[in-house]
């Protein structure tokens, strides 16, 4: 917040952000909110990054350009891998059960 003293002898000042002209008072204190706004903007960017981390198609704050769908593609590959492993295990178990039932065909 910057203030321009128009007439120091009669304590007349102007606020440059709003353009208002007023009398300067000794009993009021004015603080600049710019450092607070900078920190709030930084926290807002971090909060947006946290929300974007939940979506695989959104870019993260500290990633290289062009890596928006990396999580999505990695999810497809890992789920495909685990699907193949579970499918092969199920098929092997089914083949083992069929083999054992054929061996025991005359016993039961």
Curated annotation (Swiss-Prot):
The gene is mtrB. Belongs to the MtrB family. Pfam families: MtrB (PF05440). It is a single-pass membrane protein. NCBIfam families: methano_MtrB (TIGR04166), PRK00965.1 (NF002129). The chain crosses the membrane at residues 81-101. Its EC number is 7.2.1.4. Keywords: Cell membrane, Membrane, Methanogenesis, Methyltransferase, One-carbon metabolism, Transferase, Translocase, Transmembrane, Transmembrane helix. This is Tetrahydromethanopterin S-methyltransferase subunit B. Pathway: One-carbon metabolism; methanogenesis from CO(2); methyl-coenzyme M from 5,10-methylene-5,6,7,8-tetrahydromethanopterin: step 2/2. Part of a complex that catalyzes the formation of methyl-coenzyme M and tetrahydromethanopterin from coenzyme M and methyl-tetrahydromethanopterin. This is an energy-conserving, sodium-ion translocating step. GO terms for biological process: methanogenesis, from carbon dioxide; methylation; one-carbon metabolic process. One of its GO terms (molecular function) is tetrahydromethanopterin S-methyltransferase activity. It comes from the Archaea. InterPro entries: MtrB_MeTrfase (IPR008690). The complex is composed of 8 subunits; MtrA, MtrB, MtrC, MtrD, MtrE, MtrF, MtrG and MtrH. Its main location: membrane. It is an enzyme of class 7 (translocase). It catalyses: 5-methyl-5,6,7,8-tetrahydromethanopterin + coenzyme M + 2 Na(+)(in) = 5,6,7,8-tetrahydromethanopterin + methyl-coenzyme M + 2 Na(+)(out). HAMAP family: MtrB. GO terms for cellular component: plasma membrane. It is found in: Cell membrane. It comes from Methanosarcina mazei (strain ATCC BAA-159 / DSM 3647 / Goe1 / Go1 / JCM 11833 / OCM 88) (Methanosarcina frisia).
